[in-house]
Each structure stands twice: as structure tokens, then as C-alpha cells.
């Protein structure tokens, strides 16, 4: 009997050693970043740079260039927020699947700290960049914390509810209150009522309904993103939905306006895909294009993992926070320092060339920086303060 127990203990120890070896072999692949996510994040940041430079530096000139730049309006930012939701899911998936409450508590606290960090960073330069998304971002994250362990159905219903609630709010409150749309200034931003109104209802990226982008991203991140069938199906479904919404929007405005320019302008606010106000047609348009871009990036990055462009965009996406802040402080700051009185008066071609040039510098910086450092400058500070 003793001999049997001794033999059993040896076998158990051997089994444990084998298990540890297997875990060490398997874990790295499980923890490996999905390259396509970072590539999509890089493209989203570049899209936001194009949109924001166009607004701030100037968009005078050729209509076709303005139309091209206008493609990114609201869509790059929506993709950026959806990707944040995906990131939150990837942070929490392991703890939730293993029902590891202590690990989940640590991750929840980390998300809470990062939300506060982003809120403070965003608010700190709102005076020079009123269209900041980071302080909104922080509030979205605080709300998503409430849904970390919720069922997927609850997450989707909550996200759709936020989209539906917004037009209901419009029937009670004036969307234009506080705004000077000629200068894009929010007149009572620094009052309690004005700040809360801007944050939740009629700011550039209001909590209602923009939090739904992050909730949809969180739902998406909980899926099996290494399942090729799911990724390809999502790509085609969302691409078709996006195209159908664009067609529906265009023909609805054309038919109902009957060629009247004033009517077309008014109808565009309701049936168009512009981000302000963020009505359901824009929200679903933003969600569909975000999923289409993310899944396309996952598919392409998987097939061309060693491609120099994919590698560069992968590294750029990992420094997305740094580049978002840099495009305001450095990118816009340089142009304003050269000629403050001309801000907003430059041609759209100049704004586009400058945006693409700045984006290229960001990519080169990311490639060089990642050779020496694991995290971007601002990402490193955030992790030091929140991990």
C-alpha cells in the first residue's frame, strides 16, 4: 500500500511538472496581442488627426477634397471608442471566464483609475481643444465597469437603449443650447449646468448615446476574435449594413427635400450620418463601420503579419493615447505658433497634407520608440499611476 502511494505521489508530481511546462508553452500564445486590433487603433487615430486638423486648421477650397476628408467625420472617433471597449473586454475576459473574483477586482480598480486619469488629462487641455474625447472616454469607462460581469444580451440591450433614449431627450431639451456653431464654442462649459449638459447630452461626444459605442466594443471583445468564421461574417454583415445605411440616408434626403437646398440641410440633421446630433442613424452607421474596420484589420494583419506596413501600424496603435494628445499639443500647436490669426483659414488641401505628414511622423516615431521601450510615453505614465 505504501509503495502504491509513493508511486502515485511521483506520478502526480510528474503530472504537475508536465502541466507547468504545457502552461508555459500555451500562455504566451493566449496572451499574445491581436495585431489587427492595434492596426485598427492606428487607423482610427490617423482618421481623427485628419478630421481634427481639417476642423481647426481649415477646410477652404476644393469640394472633392472636403468630401474625401468628410468620410472620416465621426467614424474614426466611433472606431476609437469601440476599440476601447474591445480593450476592456480583453483585460477582463480571463478573470470572468475563470470566475477569479480577486483578479477581477484588481482589473476593475485598474479600469477605474485609468478612467479618472483619462478624464483629468482630457479636461486639462479642453481650453485649447474643446473637441477633446478623452474626458468623455473616462465617463464611458466608468459606465462600462457596471457591465463587466453582465450577460451579453444585457450589454447589447443597454447599448441600444442609450441610442434610442437620445432622440427622446431631444424632444424635451434644445440640442443647440450653449452652442455657438459658427465658432464651435460652448459658452457656459465651465458652469455646473453647462458642463453636465455638455458631458451627457450635447457635447462633441455626449455620454448619451456615445457610451453605446464602448458597450458594443465590450460585447465584441468578449467574442472569439481568433475565430476566422466569426470575424469574416462580422466583416461582411457590418459592411453591408454600413452601405445600406449610407444609401438609405442619401436617397431619403434627396427624395424628401425635392431638390430644395434648405430642406436638404434640415433633413441632413435628422436623416444624415453626421455625428452632431448623434441620432440613431449615425450611431448604427458608426457601429457598423467600426466593426467592419476592426474585422478587416484582423483579417489583413493575420495574413500579412510580417509586412513592414502592418508592423509599423501595429506599433503605432500601441502608442495611440500618446499620439492623440500629441496631435493637439504639438500638431495644432505648431501651426498656431506660426500664425495664430490664420487658424481655421487654411485650405483643406494644406490641412490634409499636414495631417498625413504628421501621421507619418507618428508612425516613424512609434517604430523607433518601440525598439527601445515597451510602452509609449503617455501610456507608460498611465500604467505607472494606475497599475
Q: What residues fall within each predicted segment?
A:
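Alpha-helical transmembrane segments and their immediate juxtamembrane cytosolic regions
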Residues: 2-387
Amino acid at each position: 500500500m505504501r509503495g502504491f502511494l509513493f508511486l502515485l505521489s511521483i506520478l502526480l508530481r510528474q503530472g504537475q511538472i508536465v502541466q507547468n511546462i504545457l502552461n508555459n508553452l500555451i500562455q504566451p500564445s493566449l496572451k499574445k496581442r491581436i495585431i489587427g486590433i492595434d492596426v485598427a487603433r492606428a487607423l482610427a487615430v490617423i482618421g481623427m488627426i485628419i478630421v481634427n486638423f481639417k476642423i481647426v486648421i481649415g477646410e477652404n477650397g476644393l469640394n472633392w477634397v472636403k468630401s474625401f476628408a468628410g468620410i472620416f467625420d465621426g467614424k474614426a472617433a466611433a472606431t476609437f471608442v469601440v476599440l476601447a471597449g474591445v480593450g476592456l473586454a480583453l483585460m477582463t475576459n480571463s478573470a470572468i471566464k475563470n470566475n477569479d473574483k480577486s483578479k477581477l477586482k484588481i482589473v476593475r480598480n485598474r479600469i477605474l483609475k485609468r478612467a479618472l486619469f483619462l478624464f483629468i488629462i482630457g479636461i486639462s487641455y479642453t481650453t485649447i481643444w474643446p473637441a477633446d474625447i478623452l474626458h468623455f472616454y473616462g465617463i464611458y469607462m466608468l459606465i462600462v465597469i457596471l457591465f463587466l460581469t453582465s450577460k451579453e444580451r444585457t450589454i447589447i440591450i443597454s447599448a441600444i437603449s442609450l441610442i434610442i433614449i437620445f432622440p427622446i431627450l431631444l424632444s424635451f431639451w434644445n440640442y443647440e443650447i450653449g452652442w455657438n456653431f459658427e465658432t464651435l464654442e460652448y459658452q457656459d462649459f465651465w458652469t455646473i449646468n453647462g458642463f453636465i449638459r455638455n458631458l451627457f447630452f450635447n457635447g462633441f461626444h455626449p455620454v448619451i448615446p456615445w457610451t453605446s459605442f464602448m458597450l458594443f466594443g465590450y460585447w465584441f471583445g468578449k467574442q472569439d476574435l481568433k475565430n476566422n468564421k466569426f470575424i469574416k461574417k462580422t466583416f461582411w454583415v457590418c459592411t453591408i449594413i454600413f452601405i445600406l445605411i449610407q444609401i438609405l440616408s442619401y436617397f431619403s434626403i434627396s427624395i424628401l427635400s425635392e431638390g430644395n437646398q434648405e430642406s436638404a440641410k434640415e433633413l441632413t440633421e435628422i436623416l444624415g450620418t453626421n455625428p452632431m446630433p448623434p441620432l440613431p442613424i449615425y450611431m448604427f452607421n458608426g457601429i457598423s463601420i467600426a466593426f467592419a474596420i476592426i474585422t478587416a484589420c484582423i483579417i489583413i494583419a493575420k495574413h500579412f503579419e510580417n509586412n513592414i506596413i502592418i508592423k509599423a501600424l501595429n506599433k503605432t496603435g500601441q502608442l495611440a493615447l500618446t499620439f492623440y494628445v500629441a496631435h493637439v499639443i504639438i500638431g495644432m500647436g505648431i501651426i498656431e505658433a506660426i500664425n495664430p490669426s490664420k487658424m481655421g483659414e487654411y485650405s483643406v488641401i494644406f490641412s490634409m497634407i499636414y495631417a498625413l505628414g504628421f501621421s507619418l511622423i507618428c508612425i516613424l516615431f512609434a517604430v523607433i520608440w518601440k525598439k527601445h521601450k515597451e510602452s509609449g510615453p503617455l501610456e507608460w505614465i498611465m500604467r505607472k499611476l494606475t497599475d
